[in-house]
């Protein structure tokens, strides 16, 4: 049975006019290596319970979202999709009359189990757990190195049906991105022809320009909060150098002296941290150099990333988790992609492809490390990623994977998968989820037993990891890539905010 909304009734939960307060018992285990009476050592697992207090501000703000790369395929597709939903637009395809929807969005189109009623499991919308911004109410803006208006950008992208594009054109033809930061050293040379709309000046002047843009956007649109997200070109990796970008002070001094190795994406992130605005990196480059992470932590400003997890990598994080969890040993993973959009064109340059290769290749590491029966220390499957640019297929990316595994008694198993990923139609709802969850997380505070004051989540937002290929985590924190674990973490934290136990799937009431 599906219900639209619910309210938790519990002595551990209190609803006020502006907040939800919950007291939550977090049950976990501590593992220690202890010496026994006979002098040997053994592993001891100790269950423990930690009491947490959560409070969530339920006053939903008017949200502004600024996209870096607003005129790209992702930016134009997302903006078009939100307008279509807000205006209730329908359009004719060769199959049917299609209604606008938010399919592909975790927050808007997925459900959670809340319990059982008369022997039947009860489900509710994911977004019913906590008050979230309605995507129809989001105000979009942003930057692009091309001055093309969003109606023409939508047509150039060739993502949406023509009938829909015609209906959306009046809403989008007057939306023109602000000029963006352009540095040809960080992206493919073939992007130069688009760059007719750029911010001039030194890196310090560019940061100041972005800050001015954000302030004016917030004032003009009368929004309460702004979230900035990078959905522009993949950059090459920045060199991390002691004395240049390893600390907040060194990074800011490097900006002041116009250091060439500070990338455009890092400049946007610096501007956001200085303004207290959450910044999310949707591409695979190392935007968050150590100095930027240091800066975000010290200023307590949310940062999240890296790289949208939309198609092939999402499947990989599910399939490898299944194989390793089933006691099957993946020994070779070969992933081939070809695509024809501007992302593919930019990735045809070796230096930008390397950024993508790293983010796509590391996705299986934690799953391999979890099973010492299958894998010796340091052992890892052969893992190859190939991306080629084929203009004809446009935004309809093809992903082909071959998984070879060892099975019982020396046998071999091979799984071959073909995945046609409509790149921007998969990425757009992920962008939406990232900005909505980033905003929500800024309204949640908590404290553990013994802590005197409530505080926010760590500025490095692991809560967003379900949506990213290479999750950014605080120093010393394990990286989790298995998709089911990432979703469970996000859902269970939100459940804790309303005093609900984690969904453990034991269903003891029916045993």
UniProtKB/Swiss-Prot annotation:
Name the InterPro entries for this protein. Myo-inos-1-P_Synthase, Myo-inos-1-P_Synthase_GAPDH, NAD(P)-bd_dom_sf
Q: In which pathway does it act?
A: Polyol metabolism; myo-inositol biosynthesis; myo-inositol from D-glucose 6-phosphate: step 1/2
What are the required cofactors?
NAD(+)
Q: In which tissues is it expressed?
A: Expressed in siliques, leaves, roots, seed endosperm, but not in embryos. Highest expression in leaves, but restricted to vascular tissue in older leaves.
Q: Which GO terms describe its molecular function?
A: inositol-3-phosphate synthase activity
* UniProt subcellular location: Cytoplasm, Cytosol; Nucleus
The record's EC number reads 5.5.1.4
Q: Does the keyword Isomerase apply?
A: yes
> Chief location of this protein?
cytoplasm
- Which Gene3D superfamilies has this protein been placed in? NAD(P)-binding Rossmann-like Domain (3.40.50.720)
Annotated residues that bind NAD(+) are located at 71-74, 144, 181, 191, 194, 231-234, 282-283, 307, 310, 341-343, 356, 394-395, 423-424
What the entry lists under SUPFAM superfamilies is as follows: Glyceraldehyde-3-phosphate dehydrogenase-like, C-terminal domain, NAD(P)-binding Rossmann-fold domains
Asked if the Swiss-Prot or TrEMBL record annotates the protein with the keyword Ion transport, the reply is no
Q: Which UniProt keywords apply?
A: Cytoplasm, Inositol biosynthesis, Isomerase, Lipid biosynthesis, Lipid metabolism, NAD, Nucleus, Phospholipid biosynthesis, Phospholipid metabolism
Catalytic activity as recorded in UniProt: D-glucose 6-phosphate = 1D-myo-inositol 3-phosphate
List the effects observed when the gene is inactivated: Shorter seedlings with deformed cotyledons and altered root cap organization. Spontaneous lesion formation on mature leaves when plants are transferred under long days. Enhanced basal resistance to pathogens and increased sensitivity to abscisic acid during seed germination and root growth.
Pfam families associated with the record = Inos-1-P_synth (PF01658), NAD_binding_5 (PF07994)
What induces this protein's gene, according to its Swiss-Prot or TrEMBL record? Up-regulated by the IPS1 protein itself. Down-regulate upon flagellin treatment.
GO BP of this protein: embryo development ending in seed dormancy; inositol biosynthetic process; myo-inositol hexakisphosphate biosynthetic process; phosphatidylserine biosynthetic process; post-embryonic development
| GO CC terms of this entry | cytoplasm; cytosol; nucleus
- Member of which family? Belongs to the myo-inositol 1-phosphate synthase family.
Briefly state the protein's biological role.
Key enzyme in myo-inositol biosynthesis pathway that catalyzes the conversion of glucose 6-phosphate to 1-myo-inositol 1-phosphate in a NAD-dependent manner. Catalyzes the majority of myo-inositol synthesis required for plant growth and development. Acts as a repressor of programmed cell death and protects plant cells against cell death under high light intensity or long days. Controls its own transcription by inhibiting ATXR6 activity. Reduces the deposition of inhibitory histone marks on its own promoter.
**How does this chain assemble?**
Homotrimer or homotetramer. Interacts with ATXR5 and ATXR6.
The record's annotation in PANTHER family points to: MYO-INOSITOL-1 PHOSPHATE SYNTHASE
What is this protein called in UniProt?
Answer: Inositol-3-phosphate synthase isozyme 1
Per the UniProt record, the source organism is Arabidopsis thaliana (Mouse-ear cress)
Q: Which gene encodes it?
A: IPS1
């Amino acid at each position: 049975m599906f219900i639209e909304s619910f309210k938790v009734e519990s002595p551990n939960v209190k609803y006020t006019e502006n907040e939800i307060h919950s007291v939550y018992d977090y049950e976990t285990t501590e593992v220690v290596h202890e010496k026994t009476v006979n002098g040997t050592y053994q592993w001891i697992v100790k269950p423990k319970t930690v009491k947490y207090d959560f409070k969530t501000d339920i006053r939903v703000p008017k949200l502004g979202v600024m996209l870096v790369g607003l005129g790209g395929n992702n930016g134009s597709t997302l903006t078009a999709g939100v307008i279509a939903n807000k205006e209730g637009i329908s359009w004719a395809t060769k199959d049917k009359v299609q209604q606008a929807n938010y399919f592909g969005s975790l927050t808007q189109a997925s459900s959670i189990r809340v319990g059982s009623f008369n022997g039947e499991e009860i489900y509710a919308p994911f977004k019913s757990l906590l008050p979230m911004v309605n995507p129809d109410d989001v105000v979009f803006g942003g930057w692009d190195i091309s001055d093309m208006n969003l109606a023409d950008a939508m047509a150039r992208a060739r993502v949406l049906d023509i009938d829909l594009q015609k209906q959306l054109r009046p809403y989008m033809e007057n939306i023109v991105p602000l000029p963006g930061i352009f540095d040809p050293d960080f992206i493919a040379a073939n992007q130069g022809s688009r760059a007719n709309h750029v911010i001039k000046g030194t890196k310090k002047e560019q940061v100041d320009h972005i800050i001015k843009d954000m302030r004016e956007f917030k004032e003009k649109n009368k929004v309460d909060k702004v979230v900035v997200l990078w959905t522009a070109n993949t950059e090459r990796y920045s060199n991390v150098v002691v004395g240049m970008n390893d600390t907040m002070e060194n990074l800011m001094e490097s900006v002041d002296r116009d250091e060439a190795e500070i990338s455009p994406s890092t400049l946007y992130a610096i501007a956001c941290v200085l303004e207290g605005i959450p910044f999310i990196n949707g591409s695979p480059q190392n935007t968050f150099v150590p100095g930027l992470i240091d800066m975000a932590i010290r200023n307590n400003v949310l940062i999240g990333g890296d790289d949208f997890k939309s198609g092939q990598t999402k499947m990989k994080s599910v399939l490898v988790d299944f194989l390793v969890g089933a006691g099957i040993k993946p020994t070779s993973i070969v992933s081939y992609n070809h695509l024809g959009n501007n992302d593919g064109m930019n990735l045809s340059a070796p230096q930008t492809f390397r950024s993508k290769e790293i983010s796509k290749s590391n996705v299986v590491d934690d799953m391999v490390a979890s099973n010492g029966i299958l894998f010796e220390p340091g052992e890892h499957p052969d893992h190859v990623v190939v991306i080629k640019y084929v203009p004809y297929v446009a935004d309809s990316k093809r992903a082909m994977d071959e998984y070879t595994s060892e099975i019982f008694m020396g046998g071999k198993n091979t799984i071959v998968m073909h995945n046609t990923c409509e790149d921007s139609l998969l990425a757009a709802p992920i962008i939406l989820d990232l900005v909505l969850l980033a905003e929500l997380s800024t309204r949640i505070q908590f404290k553990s037993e013994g802590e005197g004051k409530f505080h926010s989540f760590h500025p490095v937002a692991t809560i967003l990891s379900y949506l990213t290929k290479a999750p950014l985590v605080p120093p010393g924190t394990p990286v989790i890539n298995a998709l089911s674990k990432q979703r469970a973490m996000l859902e269970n934290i939100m459940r804790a905010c309303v005093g609900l136990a984690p969904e453990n799937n034991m269903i003891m009431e029916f045993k």
